[in-house]
UniProtKB/Swiss-Prot annotation:
Keyword Metal-binding in record: yes
UniProt domain BRCT: residue ranges: 606-685
GO molecular function: DNA binding; DNA ligase (NAD+) activity; metal ion binding
SUPFAM superfamilies xref list: BRCT domain, DNA ligase/mRNA capping enzyme, catalytic domain, Nucleic acid-binding proteins, RuvA domain 2-like
Family as reported in the entry's similarity comment: Belongs to the NAD-dependent DNA ligase family. LigA subfamily.
GO biological process, one term: DNA replication
Binding site for Zn(2+): C420, C423, C438, C443
Function field: DNA ligase that catalyzes the formation of phosphodiester linkages between 5'-phosphoryl and 3'-hydroxyl groups in double-stranded DNA using NAD as a coenzyme and as the energy source for the reaction. It is essential for DNA replication and repair of damaged DNA.
Protein name, as recorded: DNA ligase
Cofactor requirement: Mg(2+); Mn(2+)
Length: 685
């Protein structure tokens, strides 16, 4: 509510000041990742400006931050011409293609001393933003490169799109500036968006790129405002004044100037690279790809020197000074030949698509989990369907959607069985869960999966006890519980198919070595529902001994940060089961020794390290350690590694391409540590 005693001039001045402050804070948060005020203070300032502009509409300006909320709906999109065409890029698919590009470039320039700027090729939607006297006046999609759709109202809703440019360098702002960038939705936000659509019965987006494109093409910008869009700027259209004002001689200098004006530039961009360094950087992108917050499908390579760019010129559809080095395709179409059902260690029935084998990203894919009946129904996936299958990094292949246009009428609807396909016991769907479960605890399929988990590296680590051997042992009724593994002898094992005396001896020795096990690995090995490695570590470091854990109530377990009610109930129910109690007792009778947390971590507890008892979050990509290696070393030094940032987090280790966790950590005042500092503390112990 506006104070009626305030003069119009005072209110006008306040509105102007609020707009200026909100623009600065918006750049600090979305571009610099360095907020200086709390979210609550930002919201209060925004609400105050909204109140002023609502009561005095004449005070609202085209570049007001309130425009991010959205404007009234359009009936159709207008189109407009790009002053300078938005060309596409030629593609490279191998190192040799890039070498050929370099050689062609060197021949035209008559020098091989060429430096490049490289950037991740974002899998999003290309747009152009036009600024006049520093204010956003027009936003266009790429369209056909010559004409694009006008999406100005929608672009204004994107938090990382500056509505007003920040003076930089010599303090001047170009009269006209056209910048180009990629609008994306990060992976986590995409999952959240699809969950909301699933809950409201709306069709799901196939991938983040489609979601971004669909969001930008909303006629009602108020819908766009609710979508988690963001932008990275990578270049310019008309920018003669900018280039002259800042005496810009390279692409890297151009990006730095754009950053000073308030645009968000991708932190993974590297400049001044030789050909060899370019090829090395591509390999680095392939490695870090799966850890990024957003999807990339390759790397863009640009000649850095602007004079060289001008000498190289352009072809009809693409510049000669840039090329896109694409990753191997991570999406392909294939046919679902059948859908089978597998039974997991907790009894969950999982439908699995048997695919016509297809090469995706260099890996032959012949099957993919369909998760549950709801997933199949929501996506309308059928046997004999042609489907789009996706594989990103090392992630398990996923059926994205059916290609309904290719249906022939031979497709069949899949129905989840009412009885377990292995033991034929009735199955049951639990309340509020999508999973269907076999309720027979003696089901051989469940037993096999539990045993495979039990002997895995994260559990008892019984080297040599593989899938086929476990199947034989269960099928011949030689093993019916975890405890039976510790009674196996050389003669029994040697009698199995494809098993000689030496192999049998090695397995017996591996079983013997496994008998001494840390509490956290013991808990993980048991395969309790909702209890993975992180939960097992939290339980171990909280209760220290199995005896203390057995006495804990579900309420006490649920109170541990990182242990939810499902895990708490599962652990209590597991240890209350008489059969499980008997199995654990038999294991101990056969020589299993559970090392208490205090014994396992004695070095960390008796000789406190920098990380002792600290809650640590890892984000981004580390250059020298994998995520699991870093986690292991932290835990060895007494740290508690958690997955999300909260007010209780002590340290955030920020690797390359750190995202939203870094922003949140800064806003909460969490200590942020780069990789070099992190390694130094680890090495000091």
């Amino acid at each position: 509510m506006i104070d009626p005693s305030s003069s119009f001039d005072r209110i006008k001045k306040e509105a102007r000041l609020l707009r200026e402050q909100l623009h600065v804070h918006n750049i600090n948060y979305h571009v610099k990742d360095d907020p200086v005020i709390s979210d609550g203070e930002y919201d209060r300032m925004m609400q105050r400006l909204i109140a002023i502009e609502t009561q005095f509409p004449e005070l609202s300006t085209p570049d007001s931050p309130t425009r991010r909320i959205g404007a009234k709906a359009l009936t159709a999109f207008e189109t407009a011409e790009h002053a300078i065409p938005m060309q596409s890029l030629d593609n490279a698919f191998s190192d040799q293609d890039v070498i050929d590009f370099h050689n062609r470039t060197a021949k035209i320039l008559n020098t091989s001393d060429i430096r490049y700027t490289v950037e991740p090729k974002l899998d999003g939607v290309a747009v152009e933003l036009r600024y006049e006297q520093g204010s956003l006046t027009l936003a266009l999609t790429r369209g056909d490169g010559t004409m694009g759709e006008v999406i100005t109202d929608n672009a204004r809703t994107i938090p990382s799109v500056p509505l007003k440019l920040a003076p930089a360098g010599n303090g001047t702002i170009p009269d006209v500036l056209e910048v180009r960038g990629e609008v994306i939705i990060n992976s986590k936000d995409f999952e959240g968006l699809n969950k909301k659509r699933l809950a409201t019965g709306e069709p799901l987006f196939a991938n983040p790129r489609n979601a971004a494109a669909g969001s930008l093409r909303q006629l009602d910008s108020r819908v766009t405002a609710k979508r988690p869009l963001e932008i990275f700027v990578y270049g310019v259209g008309r920018a003669q004044e900018l280039m002259a004002n800042f005496d810009i001689g390279s692409h890297s200098a151009l990006l730095e100037s754009l950053k000073r004006l308030g645009f968000r530039i991708n932190p993974l961009i590297r400049s001044g690279l030789s050909l060899t360094e370019v090829l090395d950087r591509f390999k680095a992108f392939e490695t870090m790809r799966q850890d990024l917050d957003y999807e990339i499908d390759g790397m863009v390579i640009k000649v850095d020197d602007i004079v060289f760019q001008e000498r190289l010129g352009t072809k009809a559809r693409s510049p000669r000074w840039a090329i896109a080095y694409k990753f191997p395709a991570m999406e392909e179409t294939t046919v679902i030949n059948d859908i089978i059902v597998q039974v997991g260690r907790t009894g969950t029935l999982t439908p699995v698509a048997i695919l016509e084998p297809v090469n995706i990203g260099g890996v032959m894919v012949a099957r993919a989990s369909l998760h549950n009946q709801d997933e199949i129904q929501n996506k309308d996936i059928r046997i004999n369907d042609t489907v789009l299958v996706k594989r990103a990094g090392d992630v398990i292949p996923k059926v994205v959607k059916p290609v309904t246009a290719l249906r022939t009428g031979s497709e069949r609807v899949f129905v989840m069985p009412t009885h377990c396909p292995v033991c034929h016991s009735p199955v049951r769907r639990l309340d509020n869960e999508a999973a269907v479960k076999c309720i027979n605890a003696s089901c051989k399929a469940q037993l096999k999966q539990r045993l495979k988990h039990f002997v895995s590296k994260g559990g008892f680590d019984m080297e040599g006890l593989g899938t086929k051997l476990i199947d034989q042992l269960v099928d011949r009724t030689l093993v019916g519980s975890f405890a039976d593994l510790f009674t196996l002898d050389r003669e029994t094992l040697a009698a199995m198919d494809r098993m000689g005396e030496k192999s049998a001896t090695n397995i017996v020795q591996a079983i013997e070595r496994s008998k001494r096990i840390p509490l956290k690995r013991f808990l993980f090995a048991l395969g309790m529902a909702h209890t993975g490695e992180s939960a097992a570590q939290l339980l171990s470091s909280t209760f220290f001994t199995l005896e203390a854990l057995l006495k804990a109530s579900a309420e006490a377990l649920g109170a541990i940060e990182g242990v939810g009610p499902k895990t708490a109930d599962s652990v209590v129910a597991f240890f209350a089961n008489p059969d499980n109690q008997e199995t654990i007792a038999r294991m101990m009778e056969n020589g299993v020794v559970i090392e208490n947390h205090t014994v396992v971590e004695s070095a960390a507890l008796d000789n406190a390290t920098f990380f002792s008892e600290k809650r640590v979050v890892l984000t981004g990509t580390l250059g020298t350690l994998t995520r699991s290696e870093a986690k292991q070393r932290l835990e060895e030094q007494g740290a508690r590694v958690v997955s999300s940032v909260s007010k209780n987090t002590d340290i955030l280790v920020a690797g390359e391409a750190s995202g939203s966790k870094l922003v949140k950590a800064r806003s909460l005042g969490v200590t942020i540590m780069d990789e070099q500092t992190f390694l130094e503390h680890l090495d000091r112990g």
